[in-house]
Every structure is written in C-alpha cells, then in structure tokens.
C-alpha cells in the first residue's frame, strides 16, 4: 500500500471523498484539512485577518510567522513521508507546487480529474491521470 499526500484546494468538493476512498483501499493518507498534529490546517487569516490584502513586503514577513513556519514544516514532513502524490483538481498554486516537489523528488504523482478541466500538456511530467476514483485506486 502507498503513503499518499493528497494535494488539492480547501474549496475542492472532491477532496474528502478522495481521502476516504484511499483509506478504505488500505493506503495511508496525509489530509491537510485534518493534519495528524491537530488543528484545522493553515489559513493566512489565522496570522492576520487582512492577509488577503497584504502588500508583498507583508507577505514576505508573514512567511516567517510561527504559524506559517509550523504548517510549512508539517507539510514538508508529510511530502517527505509520502511515496505518492495525488493531485486532485480543481486546485491552485500550492497543490501544484507540492505535486511538482514530489515529482522532482522522484516520487509518483497521479492527477485526478473528476470533472474535465482545460487540457494541460505538462501533466505528462507526472505518472498518470485518472478520471474516476475507481481508476485512481486501480492506478495506485
């Protein structure tokens, strides 16, 4: 069985079912929404409610806030722990960065596309794409 880092978005409606189905299939799964160290994951607004409107300098400073440092370390530990990344679309910058890190580390990356997005050629950098949960689980 695989140790899986599921990379996605807080707003992704498919994420909870993906985590559940992967666990039911016997895989170990890192769930950033419910991290093993407790808490409810990381939100920039936990540092500052005005974070969405920050200047670049405020953002750069925020990267060194203890909450940001703690969550970054937890996510990086999880990336190192995992042998596989499942990138669940639709998602944004962080999830794509995480998937790219995993691929660069020589780890398997599968893109799960439950609803067709604009075609992306560079997903060929990864190990495969899956259009259904059954296909995803069979691929793993």
Per-segment meaning from a language model:
Residues 1-140:
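Conserved catalytic or regulatory cores that recognize and/or transform ribose-phosphate-containing ligands
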């Amino acid at each position: 069985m695989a140790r899986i880092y599921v990379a996605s978005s807080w707003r992704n409606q498919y994420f909870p079912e993906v985590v559940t189905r992967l666990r039911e299939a016997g895989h170990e799964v890192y769930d950033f929404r419910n991290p093993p160290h407790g808490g409810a994951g990381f939100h920039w607004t936990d540092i500052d409610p005005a974070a969405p409107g920050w200047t670049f300098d405020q953002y750069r400073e925020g990267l060194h806030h203890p909450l940001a440092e703690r969550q970054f370390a937890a996510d990086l530990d999880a990336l190192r722990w995992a042998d596989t990344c499942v990138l669940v679309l639709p998602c944004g910058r962080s999830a794509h960065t995480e998937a790219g890190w995993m691929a660069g580390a020589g780890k398997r990356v599968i893109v799960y596309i439950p609803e067709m997005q604009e075609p992306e050629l560079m997903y060929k950098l990864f190990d495969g794409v899956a259009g259904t949960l059954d296909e995803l689980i069979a691929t793993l």
